[in-house]
């Protein structure tokens, strides 16, 4: 999912030149897709609760593949907008479905979420690298189409494994350890997490979406492959630290880990706002590491304070906040770039959110 959601941010740099349309106009085409990654989370989470998590995942793989192929076949702005929106809708399936799938299939939940996070980081990083490489060696159309075909194949492999009972069609649940919490405690935790999930989601989208263009501007003389490679390194490393974050979540106080991880992002974004050259890449790595390492903690906190039977819907709500901030991010990036031709104010916004 992360791989497919990351393709356009690199590919758009080539489309900008081929179609002779400005970056701020083209990046807006992702607005509805970014919104649907959030809005699709609740209905697909509900579907997985009522039907089957593994079955819903097959819809994701096949749907993402078809949508990505349509993106590659686009010859107009309107059709590309439609295809990207469809891609965002199918990308919305993973988090409200996949996270509960992982949690309920594991004994050490923090460790399991950490391993899952490694692949999330690899997906983001490889998405940029694959898109940059295929665009440079072949063309931007095949950068969408080839991964789309692979995703469809994976979807049918998953269907086959379900049919032969290698993967369960039914939903698993861990031993019931739902806890009773006071109303005031639940409200306080909910408010804090709502604010933090939105802020973390917006800062993540701001960074992931703008980074290819930021590197093009501030590092200079970089090809699509080089930009994709640098972004791949950033998210490969951050994905690995998600595993470390999962181990910490199994051993230490969840609230403490969460607060420290948020605060440490503040100086990173402050530096990113002003620094150029390869030092910028180092700061981006640190920001991504601190952002990714607290994700297992966040998911465990959310699961701890909500009933298991509603986890699909609950995680759907979470990802509406986290990914529903995507259109706001696209708007900010488009407006800030069109006015300043830079992204300093974008990363200052990130820093302020982490400080608050």
Residue ranges of model-derived segments:
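Residue-level signature of mid-helix packing/kink "hotspots" within the transmembrane helices
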Residues: 6, 34-42, 124-125, 235-243, ...
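Extracytoplasmic gate region of multi-pass secondary transporters
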Residues: 8-9, 189-239
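Helix-breaking motifs and short loop linkers at transmembrane-helix boundaries and internal kinks
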Residues: 20, 52, 73-78, 107, ...
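Conserved MFS/SLC helix-loop-helix module at the cytosolic interface between two early adjacent transmembrane helices
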Residues: 39-77, 249-252
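Cytoplasmic helix-loop-helix junction between adjacent transmembrane helices
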Residues: 83-121
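Helix-loop-helix hairpin linking two adjacent transmembrane segments in secondary transporters
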Residues: 116-166
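C-terminal transmembrane helical hairpin of 12-TM major facilitator-type secondary transporters
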Residues: 252-301
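A late C-terminal transmembrane helix in Major Facilitator Superfamily
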Residues: 305, 309-340
